[in-house]
Amino acid sequence: LYVKYILRLLHLLRPLFPQVVVNYGYHLPKAILASWIYGNPGRDLEIIGVTGTDGKTTTSTMIYHILKTAGKKVALISTVDAKVGRKNIKTGFHVTSPNPFALQALLRRMRSQKIRYVVLEVTSHGLDQFRIYPIKPKIAVLTNITHEHLDYHHTFKAYQTAKLKLFKS
C-alpha cells in the first residue's frame, strides 16, 4: 500500500530533476522493486534482447518463430504484443518497452508456464530508464543505429550508449 504512495510522490517530483537523476533515483529503484516483488523471474529464463533504431519488432518476431518452429518453449514481448504459450496478450506498449512491473509480471507468467526462451524487444528509452533491470540477456541483438530519438537522448553518443547497455548487462 505504501509503495503505491511512494511511487506516486516520486512521479510528481520527476519534472524537477535532470533525466540522469530521474533514471537513477526513480526508474532504477522502481525496477529493483518490481523485480523483488515478482521474484526476479528473468533469472530463470533464457532472454534474447533485441534493440536498434529500426527492425526490432520484425527481428524479434523472426527469432520467436524460428525458436517456436524448432520446438522450443518460447515467448515474445514486443512493442506490439506479448505471445505467451498460445495466447497473444495486447500490452498497450506500442512504441516502447514495458514498465518494470508489467515486464516482471509477464516474465513470472512465462516462468510459471515453463517457458525457457523469451525474445524481448528493448527500446533505447527502456534501456536508459532501467526498465529491463536486472535482466541479463544471454544473447543481445542490435539491428542498427541511426540518428533518431535525439529529442530524448540529446546526442547521438548518448543514444548509442543507451543501446549498448543491452550488451553490457
Name each model feature, range by range.
Residues L10-S169:
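Phosphate-binding loop of NTP-binding sites
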